Amino acid sequence: MDMKNITDTLNDFSDGVNPFPVEWISEHPDKVEDVLAKLSTEDQIRYAMQLRGSLMHDFINLSPNSQEVIRGLPPEELYQMIKETGIGESLPILAMMSQNQLQYSFDLEWWQRDCFVPECALKWLEFIDACDDSSIVQWLQNEDFDQKVVLFQSLIKVYKDDEMTDSYEGVEEMEHLCLDGVYDVFFKTKEPGALRRLITLLRSEDPSLYTSILEAVIWYPVTQTIETAYRWRLIRTAERGIPDFKEAMEVYSYPSPEALKIPATKLEDFSYQGGFNIAPHYPLMQTESVPFLKDVVLRLGNSPRLNTISWELVYLANKIMVADQVQPSDLETRKESLKKVLGYINIGLELGASGDLEKGARLLSHTHVLPLFQTGYQQLMTLKWKTESFLKENGSFLERLFTELDKDLLAALVVRFPRVAEVGDKKALGWRHFSSIKDVRNAESFIDQWIFHLRFARKGLGLSERTIKQYLGKCDIHENHEMMDLTNWTAMAFAHYILFKKISCAPLSEPSAKSFLEIVFLLGVFKEEVRQCDSALVDSFKQELLKLPLAWIDSDQNFLATLLNKCVVHLQQEFGRIDLKAEVDWKFTHGLCIVKNPTSL
């Protein structure tokens, strides 16, 4: 199979339909309308799902049967589009959503775990207020009664002029509404315009429901009603692959060998009320960050398995958000959770397929993505536990050797979900989830490197917490002793070897430090150029270190070479431009531990 991109593969879902260049949506909307008029609703839905955010939104609005297209989309895909576009920009979409699609959005937006959030509910009501009335009326007439009561109890107070309900407590300065001379409605919000119109609309369209809700606001016990509404919410979300916390946490259990033998899912296994059983596309659109998984998916081609993989990814990302106790209504959280899912699956798939794409395609074609995710997760937990054990045994001494970057890199490996560093657009260090075996191997190598560094510092350089504290106590040039890390202590050992033919990290006098730099640096051609260290002297020092009784293995020698290279680069950057014939102001340098008084050595 020729390699292409994910969008090309998703195009195959529409039997090759790719009706116009994407640029036409903004540049030639009239041409898009003409093309869409000739396409079936199903093809329009499939093509819409290959787009993201505002492009998808604009495409749908150009369709002559946009309501059918909207209601044919899975609620997950539609909700993702609204989050990417912004709810304020999605009013035409909201106006045409079905009751089930609206409810899916409400279930994610109005609740934070088991807590109802009236501010979020009111925000959505205000946006829906700007749309057609029919959608919200349909929702009010069909949705679970307890949820409607919870909504109104959180936003209004209701009293009647009778002996049982005429207390009118705590309504001072609240806006008031009375539509029938019976129920006095007081608004808890400062700007109740949308809520006022909703109540007025409800009484106009369904007086019986209006009365039932206001009576329930008066009489239903708040706590029990919230609990009942939450139970119904859990039932609805469970049907869409969003389980309760206990079930969601099972995704982080140890993968069982039997799980790999469970047959792959079928489309019928996923809940969907639309007329076109089309899987969401947005998870597969994110696989650019996981090349191995992406290439495996491309090898699957246009197959039913691709549909079920998409659903599995959606359901798994939802479970992850529940298990991690994060808010699924936050767009960045949704992106992060999906990246984690894809990354862990990619690691598990790479391991299971031994890096072979064809083997990976065979594995993914009949294996649920969950055990692959769990395999990737366990790899990271093994890495985390190894790091924690290493830090627990050696933490206080390591603090004396780490750079700030080393501390950050190791700290990122012991958080709840280990992270890997990456350089952003502005060359600032950022953190992301592990996404490949290469990431894991690099992190393992980093830990192994520090295991060697620790052994080298203790047995090779003769350092301990006591000796470092003793040396720093004599070093009266640097105020910030934390700036002395393993690279600097290695430079000190290099200096002692060049000057005295011994391995030591004891502080140097100013004349000794100057003599070392005069010896180790080659003469420069130009005055302003950075002078280079004499590679012959560096190699001689390396050979001397290799004589140390450290039970050297190949990786140790590689780690030593890297450490010496860092040492040389640091010396050149810090001292390579200094005029050693003049007096050196050592307090503006960093890298050598120096004392002013030679008698203190």
Give, region by region, the residue ranges found by the protein language model:
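General marker for long, soluble alpha-helical cores
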Residues: 2-96, 100-601
